Amino acid sequence: MVIVAAGASTRFGAADKLTAVVEGATVLARSVAAFVAARGVGRIVVVAHPNRVEELRAVARDAAAGREILAVAGGARRRDSVEAGVRACTSRYVAIHDGARPLVTPALIERCLAGAEGHAGAIAAIPVTDTVKEVRGGTVSAHPDRSLLWAAQTPQVVLRQAWLDAAGMSDGDETDDAAMLSRLGLECRVVEGDIENIKITRPLDLEVAAAILRGRERG
């Protein structure tokens, strides 16, 4: 299973979001802990910025409860980092997760793994509730049908070899792994995600995540 933690956190500001602390644990540690707790997860591979491999390996191992953790260097783009992680895995299916989604639950991970069985892959996603517009040159150019739109999350589970085959076909920089499989004409199943499975992108997201965690503790 691949946890991608190689980004530059450019929208987060001067601090690093992966080692930011939310309710007593770092963002990356919470992501790792969820995969450790999920059934059906084998080796966990953390993909880190080349300058931070040892640092993030240590963070991940502290959360791994004795499970095997491998840390590898990522690349300049997301797809390069994902490829490094996928190549470090040996399982038939690989779950790919953004390290900056610390509120993922073991249950969602297990649903995605189960959903991928017999298919090229499965992604977590939630229906879009806002009205979405396509904008070109500062003006609205199209009005997509909201009933057809889902916001993709992670984890995204893919057939390892299919992902590698698709990566070899083009040097594009897809922003998710369902798009990568689409190069081969393969379909991904959609597993309903979790509205609480937010991605930490800006400092305000840490406050939202902390509030969600406090709510979980209250039950």
Regions found by a protein language model. Give the residues of each.
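Conserved donor nucleotide-binding strand/loop of the catalytic core
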Residues: 64-76
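Conserved core of the sugar-phosphate nucleotidyltransferase
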Residues: 42, 103-191
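N-terminal glycine-rich phosphate-binding loop and ensuing alpha1 helix
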Residues: 1-53
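Residue-level signal for inorganic ion chemistry
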Residues: 3, 28, 85, 97-98, ...
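Hydrophobic helical membrane-anchoring modules
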Residues: 197-219
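Active-site nucleotide-sugar/metal-binding loop of Leloir-type enzymes
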Residues: 80-93
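Acidic helix N-cap motif at the loop->helix transition within catalytic regions
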Residues: 54-60
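Short beta-strand-to-loop acidic/aromatic patch adjacent to the donor-nucleotide binding site
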Residues: 91-101
